[in-house]
Amino acid sequence: MPSFDSKAFLKSVTHQPGVYRMYNAEADVIYVGKAKDLKKRLSSYFRSNVPSEKTKALVSHIHQVDVTVTHSETEALILEHNYIKQYLPKYNVLLRDDKSYPYIFISQHKHPRISIHRGVKRKKGEYFGPYPDSGAVRESLHLIQKLFPIRQCEDSVYANRHRPCLMHQIGRCLAPCVKGIVSDEEYKEQTDFIRLFLQGKDRQVIQTLVKQMESASQSLNFEKAAIIRDQIQAMRRVQEQQYVSDDSGDDLDVLGFAIENGLACVHLLMIRQGKILGSRSFFPKIPANTDKEEVFLSFLTQYYLNHTQGRTIPNRVVTSFEFNSEDLERALTELSGRKVIFQLNPKGIKGRYLKLADTNALTALTSKSNHKLTMYQRFKQLEEALVLSSIQRMECFDISHTMGEKTVASCVVFNQEGPVKSEYRRYNIAGITGGDDYAAMAQVLERRYSKQLDIDKIPDIIFIDGGKGQLNRAYEVISKHWEDWPKQPLLLGIAKGVTRKHGLETLVKISGEEFSMPSDSPALHLIQHIRDESHNHAIGGHRAQRAKVRKTSTLQNIDGVGPKRRQALLQYLGGLQELKSASVEEIAKVPGISHSLAEKIHDALKHG
């Protein structure tokens, strides 16, 4: 037990607001906290009758405490959040959410493009959002394309088109890329409608469209009036689906909360301008014996202060969980420059959505708990099958290529909660003979394990997707590096077996011994899971590599088609897919392409 002189330490602590960091004997930050009164708060940790088991465990590991005095409680709240994000302390509740939130982006262009955007806002244009997940953005874009047919294609495609694409033919794009189809004024009007729609001003758009429809009818332009009528009806259907609040400017987050058996879930229902944008479940990492209020308040603080993820602070946060919200309300009001309030158990439609959020939180928590239990049972079954005392971490490797080209290796990581996707890695393999899987495996393992590993990153099992040959090559590489490791991982090959059927895999040990497991074995299901994850991760990387060269590789094999002609073909016809569907006569219209060469290109693309 570390010798920390709390009495001597507390003598030097001020009564001002601030943040404190607690360190263990290894100089790791194990807890970060804030206080209105540092002396009063820190003194509470070292009383003889501390009721919390979590606090007792924390205090038993304290070796040093650093204090930072701040000017205000808001400053302390922000500094606490930054320290938690920096150090990821063991005894703090941690929000594991490093993904930036997506936006809908309208580019600054003569004919603007609408698209999904993540990350830093470097491009010139307008950003609408954020949305809770990419699925919600894609759904919104799909909806917008039905209502307002402006382009979603890349600028490079737009600049090189000479005829309308399929999206125009099915009424999803006005085809501004081709002269004479739509005027700049008409296109701008549809873009303006999208801006108003995304700002929640649906009624203004409908009023404008109704006037246009009446004007078209009076001018006897019934075809145009019918098109506008359909657009109005589509917008009204959308209004019925998304409508939540009588206040069209109502921005609020509805938070459902559930906690049980050391797991917690916060379900966020995001409503902006009175419309539901989508929802998302969060599962904070909780130290043992943490009380509910600390879990919920830690989530709120980390979620709303994390500006780097592009989140917006709503005017109102609705929840059924009662907690002391004064400090956070004050901080969020100060940060956003407007009044932010937390509303507890409202009535009416907000109350119904709160009930829905609470139900979703409990459902997601139950599902997560069942998954965790299943994963835990599978790990225990695998420990028994392989006669191992404990399995905390596993890694699996696979190789993917097509006829030896664009070889990609993958490494996936599992712990007792399942896949650790943040630690998945892909490796582009180079400098080997095409198709030499042994050399590819040797290269990825050398790159993976030749560097210094943290103790907790050393796997208990390393799976190799392959038989004896691959496993022996893996052993040659890894065994050179594990002499300095505190433990030696078990190496296992996963061979597909004679019939190559799922469930009939053969497992291979480094000794050459082969064995199998029953097809209904939970241990085998875990092995199949990590093998399939590795396989899919490798294939995904390989396909991405192939896609980079796909546009030109098909044309590279045609005699008489050099770089300039390839570029002319793709630019004139608008891309490889359009070129493949073009007739000989259409190809022959491309500058520099004779009729005989057009026939050769057409034949190569159709039958090559």
Curated annotation (Swiss-Prot):
GO BP terms in the entry: nucleotide-excision repair; SOS response
Oligomer and partners: Interacts with UvrB in an incision complex.
InterPro entries: GIY-YIG_endonuc, GIY-YIG_endonuc_sf, GIY-YIG_UvrC_Cho, Hlx-hairpin-Hlx_DNA-bd_motif, RuvA_2-like, UVR_dom, UVR_dom_sf, UvrABC_protein_C
Known role: The UvrABC repair system catalyzes the recognition and processing of DNA lesions. UvrC both incises the 5' and 3' sides of the lesion. The N-terminal half is responsible for the 3' incision and the C-terminal half is responsible for the 5' incision.
Domain of life: Bacteria
PROSITE patterns hit by this protein: GIY_YIG, UVR, UVRC
Similarity-based family: Belongs to the UvrC family.
Key words, A-Z: Cytoplasm, DNA damage, DNA excision, DNA repair, Excision nuclease, SOS response
Protein's gene: uvrC
Domain UVR: start-end pairs: 203-238
SUPFAM superfamilies given in the database record: C-terminal UvrC-binding domain of UvrB (SSF46600), GIY-YIG endonuclease (SSF82771), RuvA domain 2-like (SSF47781)
PANTHER family, alphabetized: UVRABC SYSTEM PROTEIN C, UVRC/OXIDOREDUCTASE
GO molecular function: DNA binding; excinuclease ABC activity
Protein name: UvrABC system protein C
Main location: cytoplasm
Domain GIY-YIG, chain residue ranges per copy: 15-93
Subcellular location: Cytoplasm
Species: Aliivibrio fischeri (strain ATCC 700601 / ES114)
GO cellular component: cytoplasm; excinuclease repair complex
